[in-house]
Design a protein with these regions (language model features):
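N-terminal secretory signal peptides that target proteins for export/translocation
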Residues: 1-4
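Bacterial N-terminal signal peptides
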Residues: 8-18
């Protein structure tokens, strides 16, 4: 049932992604190819409490990015976090990819439409500020008939609190 657990987590992040801003867009010849955005599964950061953050990439129709093992061609997307001392980022949790055919019958593995690359983030045991800005440099290779490298410097500001809740919790619901 790991598939359902992953899909449930991905759905949760997609709901959160509708709220999170800002979004960075990659354009080529006036056409928007990829929208990149950082999202998190929490409404606040608590000292020492691990949470999940992710890079959401939304590709234009017929364009794709690559999995960590891309196959005969391609490069995987990367996330380089800028975290202060004491913060830790886990490994990227790669969703199961699609098998794709690139021009020349080259077999690759990747993602069409959108992909969420999640990572566990652990803050230190004590936090002094009232908020924290997660910063990441993201890079990817997006392809259709040709491949174009893309990148973005992304940020997501979250408050620091003693207690946290899910980012998509509906408040005041009866």
């Amino acid at each position: 049932m790991i598939g359902w657990r992953y899909l449930t987590g991905a759905f949760f992040f997609l709901l959160v992604g509708a709220i999170a801003k800002p979004i960075s867009a990659q354009t080529y010849q006036g056409r928007e190819l990829v929208k990149a955005q950082l999202i998190a599964d929490t409404d606040a950061i608590a000292a020492g409490k691990t949470f999940t953050a992710g890079l959401l990439l939304r590709m234009a129709p017929h364009w794709h990015t690559y999995w960590k093992f891309s196959g005969d061609a391609g490069l995987p997307s990367e996330i380089k976090w800028t975290l202060p001392s004491g913060w830790k980022a886990g490994e990227i949790q790669w969703p199961i990819p699609l098998r794709l055919k690139d021009p020349g019958d080259i077999e690759t593995y990747g993602y069409e439409n959108e992909v969420l690359l999640m990572q566990q983030i652990t803050p230190p045991a004590s936090l002094a500020d009232s908020s924290f800005t997660l910063s990441a440099d993201a890079s990817w290779l997006v392809c259709e008939r040709l491949c174009i490298p893309g990148s973005a410097k992304l940020q997501l500001e979250l408050p620091i609190a003693v207690q946290t809740g899910p980012a998509n919790e509906i408040r005041g619901r009866r």
